[in-house]
Amino acid sequence: MIKLECLQDPSPRKRRTKLLGRGPSSGHGKTSGRGHKGDGSRSGYKRRFGYEGGGVPLYRRVPTRGFSHTRFDKCVEEITTQRLNEIFDNGAEVSLEALKERKVIHRETSRVKVILKGALDKKLVWKDAAIVLSEGVKSLIEAV
């Protein structure tokens, strides 16, 4: 059973904050732990992350290695047959522009893959070579 007198503070004890500028015997008097002169002694100074006192910082001393392909990667999105059923009418042309106009795909997208999920009841005209159909979708289109 929990008793009122047995309750403990859940947070860990906090270290006492240093009293600054309260005489030489406190250990943090006069310059208040800031040292003499320089940027750090001035009010309002905040050292930026990675700053090493004016020397060449570590991130510039370490050589760059490798290559990142993310800038050049083609953006490919997937779309289901169920979603195409909702968006397009019977006999509509399916192209990247049509999908972008309807805000189904992102404007940066350069390729779309159509995946079989649900039925595709409508006869659609595939206009774009950038739209790739999965094997299941191809067989479904032939059946329709």
Curated annotation (Swiss-Prot):
Matching InterPro entries: Ribosomal_uL15, Ribosomal_uL15/eL18, Ribosomal_uL15/eL18_sf, Ribosomal_uL15_bac-type
Gene Ontology molecular functions: rRNA binding; structural constituent of ribosome
GO cellular component: cytosolic large ribosomal subunit
Gene3D superfamilies hit by this protein: 3.100.10.10
Gene Ontology biological-process entries: translation
Keyword RNA-binding: yes
A Pfam family per the record: Ribosomal_L27A
Record has Flavoprotein as a keyword: no
Keywords, sorted A to Z: Ribonucleoprotein, Ribosomal protein, RNA-binding, rRNA-binding
Sequence segments annotated as region (Disordered): 1-48
PANTHER family given in the database record: 50S RIBOSOMAL PROTEIN L15, LARGE RIBOSOMAL SUBUNIT PROTEIN UL15M
Family to which the UniProt record says this protein belongs: Belongs to the universal ribosomal protein uL15 family.
Quaternary data: Part of the 50S ribosomal subunit.
HAMAP family linked to this entry: Ribosomal_uL15
Purpose of the protein: Binds to the 23S rRNA.
Protein name: Large ribosomal subunit protein uL15
Protein's organism: Chlamydia trachomatis serovar D (strain ATCC VR-885 / DSM 19411 / UW-3/Cx)
Gene from which the chain derives: rplO
